């Protein structure tokens, strides 16, 4: 029996991929093993997310320091959890939630709580001499995800680009994850050349995608289609498109303002807009296609497009089982984006994935725009057989680290590994 009793918990302030501070937590157990986790941070955040605790001291990191969260881990949380069993994840997470005592984890900070939650799981996995995906997922963990690669950025992730935040490719026709990654990388390099040939800038955004100045939102889809074809792949067969327009950012006074196009659309008109795009492009997944509080619009979107397209709730659902339960009962959306730091513990994250699966929904495991070398989400997506991962372009080490971990997992699984491909989706095409 591995000795997974917690001996010590320590936290420190480190930097994320955008040069902002974040929290890293180490959990030591009696076997001598240690688990370490770095917590990510988002750029466009849902109003209903768990609260990331920042210091607010303008003399350090422009107020973005996390020394308060670090202090909470090193004192309050460490004192409460030392002597507890790191392998009892549900109990650990329940204690963390009780210790905080707020609805949004705002007292101790969702960043402090998540760091401890994940580091406990990693320490227990190490004590059992198991990779994290196997420790969390058991013998059934064997599905490698289709990568949802953000290769063109706009909105809050770039400047002078499109109204919409992310344009992505999904190599659904690849025979393995390794090949899917190669296809994605080749299309990414092809896109760079397409943009360069048009005299555009090949600067990259937070998540590694290019952020050229484009005349219209649709121009982004057009150059991606060209890049796929130039790389030698067939859009609509081998490679599908996905989008995250982050429409909450465009919603004001009951309308969606597309500044690039000089238009303001009602919810019904926005649904028409997406229906038209889906009819003309091989769009398989649309995330936050409407604003986070536009419930009536979401129901309309699901009724119109739900059998053809994966409609993912991110800001809309914020990995929150209460919002997810309502969306399931009201038939708004048909997929949930899973971001660990939106809800703040591993247990609650796994609960959200389970609830989605029971309803016949899909779950897409996701990074945040502020990332690090931490690869927990790569193990999580295999552990849950979720079948889809969203972790940026095949560029920048903070993104590539996750892809490289998935390559290792696929190799380790050998003949048991199964690449999700089109099977990742629960729609008719």
UniProtKB/Swiss-Prot annotation:
Protein location: Cytoplasm; Secreted; Cell surface
Active-site residues, record numbering mapped to chain: 207, 339
Record field: catalytic activity: (2R)-2-phosphoglycerate = phosphoenolpyruvate + H2O
Transmembrane segments: none
Binding, Mg(2+): 244, 287, 314
Residues binding (2R)-2-phosphoglycerate: 165, 339, 368-369, 390
Gene3D superfamilies: Enolase-like C-terminal domain (3.20.20.120), Enolase-like, N-terminal domain (3.30.390.10)
Keyword DNA-binding in annotation: no
InterPro entries attached to this UniProt entry: Enolase (IPR000941), Enolase-like_C_sf (IPR036849), Enolase-like_N (IPR029017), Enolase_C (IPR020810), Enolase_CS (IPR020809), Enolase_N (IPR020811)
GO biological process, one term: glycolytic process
Main subcellular location: cytoplasm
SMART domains per the UniProt record, alphabetical: Enolase_C, Enolase_N
Similarity comment: Belongs to the enolase family.
Name of this chain's protein: Enolase
Organism of provenance: Roseiflexus sp. (strain RS-1)
